[in-house]
A protein has these predicted regions:
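Glycine-rich phosphate/pyrophosphate-binding loops
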Residues: 126-143
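Solvent-exposed interaction patches of small proteins and small membrane subunits
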Residues: 81-84, 107-108, 130-132
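Conserved interaction-surface patches within small, structured recognition/assembly domains
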Residues: 94-110, 121-124
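N-terminal intrinsically disordered, cationic/polar leader segments
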Residues: 36-46, 51-90, 97-98, 140-171
């Protein structure tokens, strides 16, 4: 990748961002379709994408842009039934499907949290319930996200993952 060889500059940032954003748009377009890779492969792809960025300012901007690419979320789903408690911002998570293939829709009123949702959906949505239950979110540590989230965002992310896995466990019961 020619862009990665450039010294840290605005051109480098734009080039890296455009390369990654193209990947993100394609992957987010797949969020509402059958997943073509395993959860482990999705985590690896996320790690590779985040490796392109030089600093956390770029990574946060990427998260914000991922959140903007989430599919529209119907207002009628923004109910207490679907709300994820434990998040400082408002987050809603709607499960569908069965143990063979679970699909999740989610949204937040926070731009960065919506980006986190996009990553979580990429790893966990459109997968068998057993794979969801068995998959640990290794990408969080791999990309250094745990060190760069506030405690309230970390708690919210943990609450979202717990609720998602609880839905999968319920589908298996």
């Amino acid at each position: 990748m020619l862009c990665r060889k450039w010294k840290k500059s605005i051109a480098h940032t734009v080039c890296s961002y455009n390369n990654i954003f193209g990947i993100a748009v394609r992957d987010n377009a797949r969020m509402n379709t059958i997943a073509t890779t395993s959860a482990a492969q999705a985590q690896q792809e996320i790690a590779e994408e985040f490796a392109f960025f030089g600093d956390w300012t770029e990574r946060y901007q990427y998260l914000i842009d991922l959140g903007k690419q989430l599919p529209s979320f119907p207002e009628q789903w923004k109910t207490e039934e679907y709300r994820v408690h434990g998040c400082q911002s408002m987050v809603w998570l709607v499960p569908s499907g069965d143990a063979l293939s679970m699909h999740f829709e989610a949204i937040s009123d926070s731009a960065i949290v919506s980006g986190l949702i996009a990553l979580v959906l990429r790893v966990y949505s459109d997968r068998p319930a057993q794979e969801i239950v068995d998959t640990e979110p290794q990408f969080i540590a791999t990309i250094g996200l745990a060190k760069h989230l506030s405690p309230t965002r970390s708690n919210g992310l943990a609450a979202m993952l717990a609720k998602l896995k609880a839905h999968a466990a319920q589908a298996l019961a």
